[in-house]
Amino acid sequence: MLGRLVIRRPWRVLVTSTLVLLASFAVAATTVSSLSLNRYEALGSESAAARSALDRLFDTGSPNVALLVSSSTGTVDDDAVVALGGELTEAVTAFPGVGDAWSYWSPDAPDTLAGADRRQALVLAWVPGDADHVRGEVLPALQAEVVERFDSDDVEVALGGGDEIFRVVAGQARADFLRAELIVIPLVLVLLWLVYRRLTPALATLAVGLFAAAGSLALLRLVLPFTDISTFAANISLVMGIGLGVDYSLFMIYRYREEVAAGHDTTTAVGRTVAGAGRTVLFSGLTVAAALAVLFVFPFPFLTSFAWAGIAVVLCAVLGATVALPAILRLAGRRMLRPTGPGRPEDGFWFRVSTTVMRRPFVTGGAGLLALLVLGAPTLGLTFGSPDDRVLNDGDQPVRTMYDTIRSDFAAEDADALLVVAPDTTVGPGSTAVPDSDLHDYAASLSQLPGVARVDSAAGAFTAGDRTGPAGPFGADRFESGAATRLSVLPTSERLAQDPVGLVREVRGTDAPFEVVVGGYPAELADYRDGIVDRLPLVALLILVVTFVVLFVMTGSVVAPLTAMVLNLLSLSVMFGVVVWGFQDGALAGLLGFTPTGVVEPSILLLMFCIAYGLSMDYEVFLLARIQEEYARTGDVVSSVPAGIARSAPLVTAAALILAASFAVYASSEVAFMQQLGIGMALAVAVDATLIRGVLVPAALRLTGRASWWSPGPLRALHDRFGLREHPVTPAAGPPPTSPSADTRPTLERTTR
């Protein structure tokens, strides 16, 4: 029905699609500016409870803003700098939106707020509110009205803090997005021209990609009133929109060319292309959307943003490929064909490769499997961790320079203290609930933990080896509030850089004489990380189940989907391997200019897994559809494999090349995890389209033979009722294709009925 509609009214469909595209561009521009600056925070976690208690009981919180004051001529103890530091602290304290502030120049401030050489010192502040308020409103105003006012020839003032770091990261991601647009679009057009050898199909394919990218951003605008969408979703919409638009358009145009080569006129060829290849595109889109939809499992807006973006991209790519593109095919006619005419698939490279593989499946398949295992071996050393300023590459970013100074010159990082809160606990002299001695012993115990520089509490300030508890640096009133008390556990810079998550666990594991909750910036990052890692098994299970169902509906087999899932997981191990080897261990640091931290941020790796797995299944759908089509036509379980691969592998290779190039553009990003995403995804797509589809798939299908298309009786009946049925490419006239032999007909009927 859709094909007939497009054939009858191609101009109407094309004009409507063009107007939708132009409207999408206009709406997309407003979407990008409205996206959110999400934090790495886990709602409902212990750190969230601590943050709420600090706000409610103490009117303070973990410092999320820091100002580094550097003296140009003397030290921070010089009279002029002391006076300026006091004025700066007062200005920050009084600034609209700031809830609390203190500094090295505050009364009884600890020495850790100054550098070892006394040339730098810190002002810390807590700004309540969500990330958009803090990063979008308070910080820009603080930079313009306070930092720039106090910055002078005598002292240099730099703005930092956790929210400032990721404000800069988000801004850099936006700049990378714009640069990627300028590079990806002409690059894709050139590659498409090399694939098609004609400008018309290249422009049509790029138009579908732009339709998917712009349309997805426009759809996200409809979601924004109901949920937060991360700024990084725009990057995903661009690269996946272009990639899926190219994938689906290549598949449709290749099928159109085959239909014309089989003797059908161009009008009939369009209808048969939509009726046949269009359904495969739909199933492929369902697979990719399902792989990304599992991100809704996570209660983190940063991750659910990519689920919304992925679903929107798939919807727009499928619509563009099955509605707008057929209208172009109908109007362009023979201008969409190869200038030299179609070649025989049997003469192609992939036919020869797959035939060679199937002659010796154990040898070739074993060699391919060994290569995957070797490339994926570094995955065994994967270590999850939390991001910090080092996600910004070395360069001209002041916030990165600021924290390099803090790491090298400061013994501890007060802004990253762990905050231990005991709500509804009266502590102190004369208390009947918790004696002051219990608080004294608990604070002293925390100070003995490896990597703890100092513990501040109402009972005093404790350092390792000092259990006497001298007077607290800010006075007892900062650590007591009515029926509550709190402690500040200050980590050393070395421990914070090496193992912040381990420190959080040790603090939480220390026996306390009263109920406590542990918060602070390191605890928030640890809870976010744990929230992701704990749900990884569920996400993996959901992805496997959903993709199995989609492939079963397409093939009617239980063996082929299982084989595909195993091979896809093996290909993804290569992606994980290069991330660990290149980014966690730093092998690519010199080439790309980032700073390795020895850990991988889990949410980005999870996003990569979902995208790569969905795209792998995308290619698997194309491949299996053509192999099964050949099997249904000939009944030959062996020859159908190279024949199907010969017809699908060229377009899969071309699509993978273009998609890999689009992802690889992000290797030039100034944000480390965008580089990780670009390099890892480019490699995953390249390996999947070559080693997996060209070697391991034909080897596996040769070894499983006719069992590849087997399923139990009840499932066969279910597939007969609801499964995908794609007609083969048949000549327009002449005798029907050779019927399968009698001994294979029952099996074929089960798979093609």
Walk through the language-model features, giving the residues of each.
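Short hinge/gating elements
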Residues: 34-38, 387-389
